[in-house]
Amino acid sequence: MMLRSRTGVALLLGGILAFVAVYAQEKRAASGSPPAGGDIIPLRQVSDPYPVFNGIAVDPVNNVVAMSDVNRKSLMSYSRSAVSSSGGITTPQRQAFGPLTNIGFVAGVLLDPQRKELLAVNNDIEDTMVVLPYDAQGNAAPSRLLSVPHQAWGLAMSRTHDQIAITVEIQEAVVIYKRDAKNVEAPMRYIRGPNAGLADPHGIFWDDRHNEIGVANHGNFRGLVKNVGGGCVPTGTAEPESGAVLPPSITVYSGDAKGDAKPLRTIQGEKTKLDFPMGLAEDAEHDEIAVANNGDNSVLVFSRTAQGDVAPIRTIAGAKTGINRPMGIALDTTNGEIWVSNFGDHAALVFDRSASGDVAPKRVIRTAPPGTPSPGFGNPQAVAYDSKREQILVPN
């Protein structure tokens, strides 16, 4: 969901900074001072030393919950019953990180209880899906890698179809692979086209009971771009289509949908209160859909069969909830719980499945002490200085 800098802007800013560095070196040389270089300690820095949660998944069979950490580039696993004692940091059971893992700007995460595998997709940079065993720790190599389209975000699995579905932001697509696909492998099918209603898709669920796929859309429709790169879906047209800014939505498709398939249902409109919907989860037993509503710090719950401009049947929001820029959401129907991962404050929250209103979470998992500031870094790629306001500008 982060704002992305344009390549030209990044190159321009990079050129400006390089010029400033060269000019500074020349000034130092003229003054007789030795040239700057080497292992220089910065005068000051803005950084976040703590993990920041993005995606989240829960496995009630093996009592595991896992989160993707977009800041320290890791995957973290906890006991499902873990809690932050006395407001302190919750120690994970395992944390996979390091160059061998291929974990980078990681987004959606998925747990496979049967095979005890943790799957995650890298979003803006690595363009891969990483598969690790549950017991992976430290700088562990993945058991398999799959090349996926650039800006993959959400991840869902169908045990009936033995397939994996991945949302792709910039391609306005859902790409579907064999569950055990690896290396560079074409998708089995995809959902994409002007009738599909996908617009900057993020969260996704696959409901095997009703054979449906649901997708959360920000509404930023970029058009069907031509340049798709390796491993991406074909466009079906030689010319890019014009983009549009659409209202956010949740679109639901048949689990067998492919190509330019129309949604079976669409939740969209002012009454829905959708605002930058991120993670999406379904409760097939209670016929409900839950979404992490990042734009207004809430969790919205809709009827599974909702259609059109409809209000949520429940909303979790308010100061007591601790919801702060929610990114991921997971439903544990076995234990009757909703899990929410916060991007805004180094925490994951657990609520009762039927929670509503301004209610406190049952449990909290923390990667930093309460009240620790969060700079909010996602994927900064450039920097500029506003000399008039004396401010540093960072496209995130």
Predicted features by range, described:
Residues 217-245:
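Short, conserved, GDST-rich strand-edge loop motifs in beta-rich repeat architectures
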Residues 48-62, 99-115, 147-163, 194-211, ...:
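Beta-rich, blade/repeat-based domains predominating
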Residues 32, 79-87, 131-138, 176-184, ...:
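Short loop/turn segments immediately following beta-strands, especially the blade-tip
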Residues 73-75, 127-129, 172-174, 221-223, ...:
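Structural signal for beta-propeller blades
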Residues 70, 80, 123-124, 169, ...:
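Short loop/turn segments immediately following the C-termini of beta-strands
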Residues 67, 120-121, 166, 215, ...:
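Residue position within the beta-strands of beta-propeller blades
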Residues 41-47, 91-100, 141-146, 187-194, ...:
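A short beta-strand motif characteristic of beta-propeller blades
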Residues 10-19:
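Bacterial N-terminal signal peptides
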